[in-house]
C-alpha cells in the first residue's frame, strides 16, 4: 500500500482525528496479541521487525545479520511470511523456480544469500529451517507476531521517516501503540539520518537499548554520473531511491512511484518502456522491484544495488554473540 499523506502530518490532522478511534481498537488488539506467549522454536530466533507498516530497511538489515551470524560461526536460515505471494508454505524458496507472485519479492532477494523458508505458519516454518540445517533463524518481519518465542528482536527505523504521526493504523503508520511495543525489542537499527530517527534513538537509549546506526550504500560498478534515467520503484519510500540516484549524479527525467510490493503488469512495462524511449533514457529500479518485473524486462532494466553499512559493527556483533553464543 502507498502510505497516505496525512500519516506524515501532525496527529491533529482531520483525517487522523477521524480515524483515531479505529486506531485505538486496532492498536490495542495488536498489542494484546504481541503479549501472548509463543511456541518454543527448534533453534534460537532473531527477529528483524519494525514498529510501523511499510518499508524501513528490514531486508538489507536481515542480509547483514546473516553475514554477521556466519562470521560468528552460526548457520542461519531466513524465515518470511512471504508477503505478496500466494503460496502458504512452508517451503524452501528457489529463485530459479519461484516467482514473486508465488513467494513474495523479499524472499527471492533473501534466498540469494541464505536458505529462505516461506511460511504463513511461523512454527511450521521454523521446523523446516531447522530441518534444512539452520542453528539460528533470522525472521524477516514478525515483531508483532507472537507465534514464535524470539531470542532477540531488533526494530528497524527509517531515520528520515521515523514513526510518522505516531498513531496506530489506520490513523497513522504504527502497528500498535509505541509504549506497548518497546518491551518486545532489545535494540534499534537506525537506517539513515534525520530528526525523526534521532528522536527514536534518544528514546531507545533512555530505555537502555543499544542503537545501531547504519546507512544504505550503493554498490560500485556502475557510473551513474550524467546518465539520463527513468527511475521507478514500488517500495515503502520511493523518494528515498530517487534521492540516492540523484546523489550519484544521475539525471532523472521521469519518476514512477508505485505502491509497496506492486505487482508489475504488462501495461506498466509497456508504459515505462515507451516513456524511456521518448526521453532517450535508460530504465532503472531497485533490487526488490526487479524480481517483480516480467522476464523480458529484467534483461534490459538497470538495477541499483545497495548494502547496509553500520557505523559501529563491532557493537552489533557483540550483541549477537551474547544472544547467540557459538557452541
From Swiss-Prot:
GO biological process assignments: lipid A biosynthetic process; lipopolysaccharide core region biosynthetic process
EC number: 2.7.1.130
Family matches, as InterPro entries: LpxK (IPR003758), P-loop_NTPase (IPR027417)
SUPFAM superfamilies recorded: P-loop containing nucleoside triphosphate hydrolases (SSF52540)
Sequence positions that bind ATP: 52-59
Superkingdom in the source lineage: Bacteria
Catalytic activity: a lipid A disaccharide + ATP = a lipid IVA + ADP + H(+)
Pathway annotation: Glycolipid biosynthesis; lipid IV(A) biosynthesis; lipid IV(A) from (3R)-3-hydroxytetradecanoyl-[acyl-carrier-protein] and UDP-N-acetyl-alpha-D-glucosamine: step 6/6
Disulfide cross-links: none
Molecular-function annotations in GO: ATP binding; tetraacyldisaccharide 4'-kinase activity
Pfam families, sorted: LpxK
One term under GO cellular component: plasma membrane
Keywords: ATP-binding, Kinase, Lipid A biosynthesis, Lipid biosynthesis, Lipid metabolism, Nucleotide-binding, Transferase
PANTHER family (alphabetical): TETRAACYLDISACCHARIDE 4'-KINASE (PTHR42724), TETRAACYLDISACCHARIDE 4'-KINASE, MITOCHONDRIAL-RELATED (PTHR42724:SF1)
Family: Belongs to the LpxK family.
Physiological role: Transfers the gamma-phosphate of ATP to the 4'-position of a tetraacyldisaccharide 1-phosphate intermediate (termed DS-1-P) to form tetraacyldisaccharide 1,4'-bis-phosphate (lipid IVA).
Name by which UniProt lists this protein: Tetraacyldisaccharide 4'-kinase
Native organism: Methylorubrum extorquens (strain PA1) (Methylobacterium extorquens)
Amino acid at each position: 500500500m502507498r502510505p497516505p499523506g496525512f500519516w506524515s502530518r501532525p496527529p491533529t490532522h482531520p483525517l487522523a482525528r477521524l480515524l483515531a478511534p479505529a486506531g485505538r481498537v486496532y492498536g490495542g488488539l495488536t498489542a494484546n496479541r504481541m503479549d501472548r506467549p509463543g511456541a518454543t522454536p527448534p533453534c534460537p530466533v532473531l527477529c528483524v521487525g519494525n514498529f510501523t507498516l511499510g518499508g524501513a530497511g528490514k531486508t538489507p538489515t536481515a542480509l547483514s545479520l546473516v553475514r554477521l551470524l556466519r562470521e560468528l560461526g552460526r548457520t542461519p536460515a531466513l524465515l518470511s511470511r512471504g508477503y505478496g505471494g500466494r503460496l502458504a508454505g512452508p517451503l524452501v524458496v528457489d529463485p530459479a523456480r519461484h516467482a514473486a507472485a508465488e513467494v513474495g519479492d523479499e524472499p527471492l532477494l533473501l534466498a540469494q544469500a541464505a536458505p529462505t523458508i516461506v511460511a504463513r505458519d511461523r512454527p511450521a516454518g521454523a521446523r523446516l529451517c531447522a530441518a534444512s540445517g539452520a542453528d539460528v533463524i533470522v525472521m524477516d518481519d514478525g515483531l508483532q507476531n507472537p507465534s514464535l518465542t524470539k531470542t532477540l528482536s531488533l526494530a528497524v527505523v527509517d531515520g528520515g521517516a521515523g514513526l510518522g504521526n505516531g498513531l496506530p493504523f489506520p490513523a497513522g503508520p504504527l502497528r500498535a501503540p509505541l509504549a506497548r511495543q518497546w518491551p518486545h525489542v532489545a535494540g534499534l537499527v537506525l537506517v539513515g539520518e534525520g530528526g525523526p530517527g534521532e528522536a527514536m534513538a534518544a528514546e531507545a537509549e533512555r530505555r537502555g537499548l543499544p542503537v545501531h546506526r547504519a546507512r544504505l550504500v550503493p554498490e560500485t560498478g556502475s557510473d551513474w554520473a550524467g546518465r539520463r534515467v527513468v527511475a521507478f520503484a514500488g517500495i515503502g519510500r520511493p523518494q528515498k531511491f530517487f534521492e540516492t540516484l540523484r546523489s550519484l549524479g544521475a539525471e532523472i527525467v521521469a519518476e514512477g512511484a508505485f505502491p509497496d510490493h506492486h505487482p508489475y503488469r504488462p501495461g506498466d512495462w509497456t508504459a515505462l518502456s515507451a516513456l524511456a524511449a521518448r526521453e532517450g533514457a535508460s530504465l532503472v529500479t531497485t533490487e526488490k522491484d526487479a524480481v517483480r518485473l516480467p522476464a523480458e524486462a529484467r534483461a534490459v532494466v538497470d538495477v541499483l544495488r545497495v548494502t547496509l553499512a553500520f557505523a559501529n559493527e563491532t557493537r552489533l556483533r557483540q550483541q549477537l554473540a551474547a544472544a547467540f553464543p557459538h557452541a
